[in-house]
Amino acid sequence: MSLLASPFAQLDLIRQPEQQNEPLQAFDAADEYLLNHLAEQQPASDTRVLVLNDSFGALAASLLGKVQVSSSGDSYLGALALEKNLVRNGLPFDAVRVVPASEPLAGPFDRVLIRVPKTLALLEEQLIRLQGQLAPGAQVVAAAMVKHLPRAAGDLLERYIGPVQASLAVKKARLLIATPQDKQPVVSPYPTRYRLEQPAIELLNHANVFCREGLDIGTRAFLPHLPQNLGSARVADLGCGNGVLAIASALDNPQAHYTLVDESFMAVQSARENWQAVLGEREAQMRAGDGLAGQAAQSLEVVLCNPPFHQQQVVGDFLAWRMFQQAREALVVGGALYIVGNRHLGYHSKLARLFRGVEQVAATPKFVILKARK
């Protein structure tokens, strides 16, 4: 049980995805610091509060019923955690206005509470989108654990919002308190674009997309070894990012049917725009989601995956293991999961625990491409 006690509420919170014997809490001292800081201001019930990047719903759930709260972030799992934690604590699950980071904000807001994200490009995009959304007398407060708080975060707040005052550290957390000033309107530098030589396509990347400035080296190693001659197979790109694996595969397999899934709303938005730019009106299913959770059993012949190795600042293979399990459930008997991974992660032995046969398709000094058949 993970109990968060704040001046606003006492809540029993869980992380997403749920794990048995979860060692980590669904909140940290930075969440507590933000809530205590807001409570000191004694906000009225009609105060309009925007929460950005609420990891597992701790902030929005605490504020529900005390102020008018909206929540926006780029994580489907974060939005799912908020919903489940509201229900878990007997609160109406639809009472918080949730806006994916891929959609525009609708202010004005009197207070903005920000958890500084791992990707500062996302923070920059969010601060730019606050232009014209702040009420007179508004305050913008960002928080992070000190070890995860780069100086550049304060620089971005100063550039796009106004003067910044850093708080004292409390329980190894710190606040950056920004006072809004009139600023010249800024055009966002996002999305960014880069070109590939093979296949010869241009890819668009919204602010929070992994490796938005250029193709990551794992995918670069994977692309020449994507499965061929798929016919009318049903194919999923699991953790699709900007959609490059599915798009490259679709170009070589014109009859195959594709589903693209990612837990980042901005990744799915990027994948959708890239698919349309390269493949026009060709049909594909795209969704933000918890991997292949909800995918019908035995509904896919092929799964392509470049699995992530971190969730926010937490590093580990638990997300990859979950994806492998989901792929096994979704594949037909005889279907195959294709992955790329760092050699040192030992994915071969992990896959062998779930699949009938695992073979190495190709390898580089750093990566292996594996095929696991159900």
UniProtKB/Swiss-Prot annotation:
It is found in: Cytoplasm. Coiled coil: none annotated. InterPro entries: DNA_methylase_N6_adenine_CS, rRNA_m2G-MeTrfase_RlmG, RsmC/RlmG, SAM-dependent_MTases_sf, Small_mtfrase_dom. One of its GO terms (cellular component) is cytoplasm. The lineage of its organism: Bacteria, Pseudomonadati, Pseudomonadota, Gammaproteobacteria, Pseudomonadales. Its EC number is 2.1.1.174. CDD domains: AdoMet_MTases. It comes from the Bacteria. Pfam families: MTS. Keywords: Cytoplasm, Methyltransferase, rRNA processing, S-adenosyl-L-methionine, Transferase. The keyword Transferase applies. Belongs to the methyltransferase superfamily. RlmG family. GO terms for molecular function: 23S rRNA (guanine(1835)-N(2))-methyltransferase activity; nucleic acid binding. It catalyses: guanosine(1835) in 23S rRNA + S-adenosyl-L-methionine = N(2)-methylguanosine(1835) in 23S rRNA + S-adenosyl-L-homocysteine + H(+). Specifically methylates the guanine in position 1835 (m2G1835) of 23S rRNA. It is an enzyme of class 2 (transferase). HAMAP family: 23SrRNA_methyltr_G. This is Ribosomal RNA large subunit methyltransferase G.
